Amino acid sequence: MKYKLILTNDNMNVASYNTSQLSKENVLKRIDVDTKITSQKHGYAYFNDLFVKRHSNLLLKSAKKISFVIIGIIFVMALILYLIPEFATKTNQILMVMLPYFVFIMYCINRGQEVAQAMFMNCDHSMLTYGFYREPKVILNLFKERLKSVIFINLLPAFVLATGLVFLLFITGGTTQWIDYPILFFSILAMSIFFSVHHLVLYYLLQPYNANSETKSGTYGIANGLTYLFCYYMLKIRIPIFTFGCLTILFSILYCLISLFLVYRYAPKTFHLKN
């Protein structure tokens, strides 16, 4: 296939345009350019898998570090609750109504925006100059492969956090409704998938960068700003686990379906270098 003929270190490396030399060096340090790295997959899955492996320091290791931090925090909280049992009741009360708070937490730990930026700087900025790479079939097939990778990367810390919250809820006295446990768990995963889809969809629909890796889309900045403001506002909301969890799961499913439809409908027209 065409992509294998041009899949060189230059095309899978950091942009060589007018971005700052310091930024280039920082990114390069986190990229593995070992030509021995390969993949057993085929087609667009091969292309994407090779990208992920070469950028494991930038993508996977970041998610793993966040996961270890979360494990550490959960362990410390469990230890405090064991040593000071009277904190359990208050902690339980907080957990029962603080699920909206974790919308902001999930926004902060999600690597979707960072992954999208890496995709452009270290791959798309070069590949988008090839006509075949802008063909609808190529764009949509590669989008599907990338979405799988982004969701997988972000689900690692999300799974750890979801498990930890269920554990803390249980050891602090639990809940009178057993359904709260799976709702709490799956709502955290739903948030993770939501942000993974959200950042990648924005990248494909509003592709903000030009050939010099400069952001040229005001709409992209506004969309990210509104996302931040919405998540920040969630810090003030107090709603029971069952109510907010169900709303979160349903909203995430609906949003993802609509977003994926928009990508399939419009990305072939919008995914190109900005002038």
PLM regions and their residue ranges:
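Hydrophobic alpha-helical transmembrane segments of membrane proteins
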Residues: 1-127, 138-275
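Glycine/proline-centered hinge or cleavage motifs at structural transition points of membrane proteins
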Residues: 132-136
